Curated annotation (Swiss-Prot):
The gene is uppS2. GO terms for biological process: polyprenol biosynthetic process. NCBIfam families: PRK14829.1, uppS. Catalyzes the condensation of isopentenyl diphosphate (IPP) with allylic pyrophosphates generating different type of terpenoids. It comes from Streptomyces avermitilis (strain ATCC 31267 / DSM 46492 / JCM 5070 / NBRC 14893 / NCIMB 12804 / NRRL 8165 / MA-4680). This is Isoprenyl transferase 2. Gene3D superfamilies: Decaprenyl diphosphate synthase-like. SUPFAM superfamilies: Undecaprenyl diphosphate synthase. Its EC number is 2.5.1.-.
Length: 285
């Protein structure tokens, strides 16, 4: 299979993802039941390493391959947006040695993998704060963004130095500055106004919030975007995770009745959305 995309006026062919070594294939779900945006907390690296008597850093190293496998699984299934929590604003509290490792690691992962992601048609977007981040990390993230900006097989939101509260605080600060400068009428502030001040106003809402490792919390991740997300928690640690676990989570997501605060069954909501939007849904892989 070759996935095709448009780059300017030229048609570009993306490389097809390699099948999973087990031979497993993505489940065939109706396009409207495939989550458009999956947010994932990559948790359990330290525990995985500890169970094996290894340094915590070894769990992160194994997790790099998991990232690529999950991205390929997204493309195979038809998930168009994936957000990965790579380094939070709270992670600065870890030991200087681990912070140093994670800075180097995130920089090097992007450097090592950006060509492969580009070949697969993945658009990379960095989400997070610039202050405190190493210049070399910022540079690699910016290079990756520029290199992949026209890709359209899927979008990876790579969250480095990100926190949901930090994003909302930054949005509030920017809004306050615009109010003080007379560029924004506070009486007209709405949810749509706040959305415009987020790091990526066009980031779609999270449909499926996925966390491996057995922990059941959001950890300050994409708070605004996850307001109506379906939560799936899995016991597998991130280094043991692969695209089959992603697919299981998506099958569970597809079985749920999303009401968005109302009392109308999911099927009827989908029908109304199709009528209003002209069947704008995620297409089958």
């Amino acid at each position: 299979m070759v996935v095709r995309g448009i780059l300017g006026r030229q048609r570009r062919e993306y490389r097809a993802p390699e099948p999973h070594p087990s031979g497993a294939r993505a489940p065939k779900l109706p396009g409207e039941l495939i989550p458009n945006h999956v947010a994932c907390v990559m948790d359990g690296n330290g525990r995985w390493a500890k169970e094996r008597g290894l340094p915590r850093t070894e769990g992160h190293k194994v997790g790099e391959g998991v990232v690529m496998d999950v991205l390929k699984g997204c493309i195979e299934l038809g998930v168009k947006n994936l957000s990965l929590y790579a380094f939070s604003t709270e992670n600065w509290k870890r030991s200087p040695e681990e912070v140093r490792f994670l800075m180097n690691f995130n920089r090097d992962v992007i450097r090592r993998r950006r060509d492969e992601m580009d070949a697969l048609g993945i658009r990379i977007r960095w989400v997070g704060r610039m202050p405190k981040l190493w210049k070399s990390v910022v540079q690699e993230l910016q290079i990756a963004q520029e290199q992949t900006k026209d890709n359209d097989a899927m979008t990876l939101y790579f969250c480095v130095n990100y926190g949901g509260r930090a994003e909302l605080a930054d949005a509030a600060k920017a809004m306050a500055e615009d109010v003080a400068a007379g560029r924004l009428d506070p009486a007209k502030v709405s949810e749509k106004t706040i959305q415009k001040y987020l790091y990526y106003p066009d980031m779609p809402d999270v449909d499926l919030f996925l966390r491996p490792s057995g922990e059941q919390r959001t950890s300050n991740y994409l708070l605004w975007q996850s307001s109506y997300a379906e939560m799936v928690f899995q016991d597998v640690l991130w280094p043991d995770f692969d695209r089959r676990d992603l697919w299981r989570a998506c099958v569970e997501y597809a079985s749920r009745d999303r009401r968005f605060g109302g009392a109308v069954p999911n099927e009827q909501l989908l029908e109304m959305e199709r009528d209003m939007k002209g069947s704008e849904g995620v297409q089958d892989a």
